[in-house]
């Protein structure tokens, strides 16, 4: 079974309290989502391999550690996942970015793919799938299915807020994918919104509500 890691760093929790607030506007919301994603990335990437190198400082020669050539891929689930990309790229600017677009069929309520553009070397990369809200888990499970069909193997899921129902759905469908969260909330309501959540992340990011 995959691990569920709730990152309870004080800075993350402080910023999360602001984006939950219904009076926080799109500009501040976008900035804080990026900042939270960046802070979460520190924890998520702590197992990246390093190697010892020597460099010349102005004083003497020093032994240091650098990343050992690990390739990273970011895959935001459109559209809300876009809000998490820039914060992580600011830490790891050489990461490749793919995109997956899904919508929910109004009759079947199942996710339908409308866009997919992924790096061609998925199997060589550690992949971070980005979606601010893990509600029912349907879109995330469908995205992970698609990524694995195209060769992705080493995958981690980053979400700001999740409902227990979504976590369970991902764990049952993809027990090899670890899940990193800023908060695990109480439940879903009858409209499949996370309670207490923060509303529709996409609408709040892009000011479309």
Swiss-Prot record:
<dbReference type="GO" id="GO:0000287">
    <property type="term" value="F:magnesium ion binding"/>
</dbReference>
<keyword id="KW-0328">Glycosyltransferase</keyword>
<dbReference type="GO" id="GO:0006223">
    <property type="term" value="P:uracil salvage"/>
</dbReference>
<comment type="function">
    <text>Catalyzes the conversion of uracil and 5-phospho-alpha-D-ribose 1-diphosphate (PRPP) to UMP and diphosphate.</text>
</comment>
<feature type="binding site">
    <location>
        <position position="200"/>
    </location>
    <ligand>
        <name>5-phospho-alpha-D-ribose 1-diphosphate</name>
    </ligand>
</feature>
<comment type="pathway">
    <text>Pyrimidine metabolism; UMP biosynthesis via salvage pathway; UMP from uracil: step 1/1.</text>
</comment>
<comment type="similarity">
    <text>Belongs to the UPRTase family.</text>
</comment>
<feature type="binding site">
    <location>
        <position position="79"/>
    </location>
    <ligand>
        <name>5-phospho-alpha-D-ribose 1-diphosphate</name>
    </ligand>
</feature>
<feature type="binding site">
    <location>
        <position position="104"/>
    </location>
    <ligand>
        <name>5-phospho-alpha-D-ribose 1-diphosphate</name>
    </ligand>
</feature>
<keyword id="KW-0547">Nucleotide-binding</keyword>
<protein>
    <recommendedName>
        <fullName>Uracil phosphoribosyltransferase</fullName>
        <ecNumber>2.4.2.9</ecNumber>
    </recommendedName>
</protein>
<keyword id="KW-0021">Allosteric enzyme</keyword>
<feature type="binding site">
    <location>
        <begin position="199"/>
        <end position="201"/>
    </location>
    <ligand>
        <name>uracil</name>
    </ligand>
</feature>
<dbReference type="InterPro" id="IPR050054">
    <property type="entry name" value="UPRTase/APRTase"/>
</dbReference>
<keyword id="KW-0460">Magnesium</keyword>
<dbReference type="InterPro" id="IPR034332">
    <property type="entry name" value="Upp_B"/>
</dbReference>
<dbReference type="GO" id="GO:0004845">
    <property type="term" value="F:uracil phosphoribosyltransferase activity"/>
</dbReference>
<dbReference type="GO" id="GO:0044206">
    <property type="term" value="P:UMP salvage"/>
</dbReference>
<feature type="binding site">
    <location>
        <position position="194"/>
    </location>
    <ligand>
        <name>uracil</name>
    </ligand>
</feature>
<dbReference type="Pfam" id="PF14681">
    <property type="entry name" value="UPRTase"/>
</dbReference>
<dbReference type="InterPro" id="IPR000836">
    <property type="entry name" value="PRibTrfase_dom"/>
</dbReference>
<dbReference type="InterPro" id="IPR029057">
    <property type="entry name" value="PRTase-like"/>
</dbReference>
<keyword id="KW-0808">Transferase</keyword>
<dbReference type="InterPro" id="IPR005765">
    <property type="entry name" value="Ura_phspho_trans"/>
</dbReference>
<feature type="binding site">
    <location>
        <begin position="131"/>
        <end position="139"/>
    </location>
    <ligand>
        <name>5-phospho-alpha-D-ribose 1-diphosphate</name>
    </ligand>
</feature>
<dbReference type="GO" id="GO:0005525">
    <property type="term" value="F:GTP binding"/>
</dbReference>
<keyword id="KW-0342">GTP-binding</keyword>
